[in-house]
């Protein structure tokens, strides 16, 4: 991995996954089995359960009032079936452990997703960000949020909890180019500075929430639908880390809104530009691209049709020439060509080099 992308694996994060289908007590016990930990019921207004793992880190299970509660039979259930799993601060190397926790919760009966008004929120540590890097961050989300809305299938059921970036804020932060965090904070709250002390400030319900950054030093990505699929959860985290790394390493990220008539191809090019390259991130790319339409291999799909036809013709001619050299009879099925790439085959990263300028995909 290029040194420009090393930060993807060095940034700390945390994750919240909302779910139902099991009780908070059942969720905590399932997690404890994987974490080799102990469960403590602290109670309180969020009826908190704490699971302490082998590294003495605290995982929490709490109540969340936004979740539509169901039991394991699919029937409406009491609020004891409102479950939000909160991880401790994690590092990239902890992702496999987190995936085991996710699998355990699913096996225990956990269900999640838009039907239950359940989402996943990822927190990225940002106490070392500069004002320019915060500006880069919000510009990335502003420019790519239409892509993200489609790729992540942001549910209309969750729109009140996850909106697109505040256009006025994006306009002002790019006009004023603040050099201190206090100015960014004032722009974020539109001068209503008392909101910074409110836990449930209305400013938090956007795709990239800086309210938590001003309170705790980490920002929150709220666009993800809830998932208990271990591979999807990993892809959500990796995307968040890659965006963070871009905000940290790019000199300037434009707020210009990206558009494309081949969303699947364009989004894949962007993922490669973020550093999600090679077999290590192949499954992540697959999860992030699976809801998008278009030809993944060609910017203009009609070019792909022509290229595949030419390749098929070329290979058939090569086969015909080989038969003639061997003086073999031509079989009746000679019109078929083998190993012609299908439309859905993912091209090599090298085939996408140099296209970001054309697609206005650069940040």
What residue spans do the PLM features occupy?
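C-terminal accessory/tail domains of diverse enzymes
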Residues: 1-114, 127-363
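Short, conserved phosphate-binding/catalytic loop or strand-edge motifs used
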Residues: 116-124
């Amino acid at each position: 991995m290029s040194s420009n992308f090393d930060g993807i694996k060095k940034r700390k994060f945390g994750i919240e996954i909302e779910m139902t289908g099991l009780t908070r007590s059942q969720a905590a016990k399932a997690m404890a089995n994987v974490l080799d930990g102990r469960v403590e019921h602290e109670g309180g207004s969020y009826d908190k359960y704490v699971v302490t793992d082998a590294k003495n880190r605290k995982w929490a299970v709490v109540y969340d009032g936004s979740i539509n509660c169901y039991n394991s039979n699919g029937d409406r259930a009491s609020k004891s079936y409102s479950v939000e799993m909160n991880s401790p601060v994690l590092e990239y190397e902890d992702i496999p452990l987190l995936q085991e926790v996710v699998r355990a919760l699913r096996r225990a009966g956990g269900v999640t997703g838009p039907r239950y008004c359940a989402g996943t929120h990822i927190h990225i540590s940002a106490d070392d960000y500069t004002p320019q890097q915060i500006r880069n961050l919000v510009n990335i989300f502003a420019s790519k949020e239409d892509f993200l809305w489609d790729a992540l299938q942001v549910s209309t059921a969750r729109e009140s909890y996850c909106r697109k970036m505040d256009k006025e804020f994006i306009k002002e932060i790019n006009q004023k180019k603040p050099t201190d965090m206090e100015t960014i904070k004032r722009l974020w709250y539109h001068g209503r500075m008392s909101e910074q002390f409110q836990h449930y400030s209305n400013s938090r319900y956007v795709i990239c929430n800086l309210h938590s950054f001003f309170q705790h030093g980490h920002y929150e990505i709220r666009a993800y639908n809830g998932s208990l699929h271990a591979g999807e959860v990993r892809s959500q985290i990796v995307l968040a880390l890659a965006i963070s790394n871009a905000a940290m390493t790019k000199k300037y990220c434009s707020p210009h809104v990206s558009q494309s008539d081949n969303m699947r191809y364009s989004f894949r090019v962007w993922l490669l530009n973020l550093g999600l390259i090679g077999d290590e991130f192949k499954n992540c790319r697959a999860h992030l691209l699976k809801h998008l339409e278009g030809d993944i291999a060609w910017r203009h799909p009609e070019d792909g049709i022509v290229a595949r036809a030419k390749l098929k013709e070329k290979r058939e001619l090569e086969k015909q020439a080989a038969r003639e050299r061997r003086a073999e009879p031509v079989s009746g099925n000679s019109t078929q060509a083998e190993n012609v790439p299908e439309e859905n085959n993912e091209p090599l990263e090298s085939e996408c080099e140099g296209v970001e300028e054309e697609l206005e995909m650069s940040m």
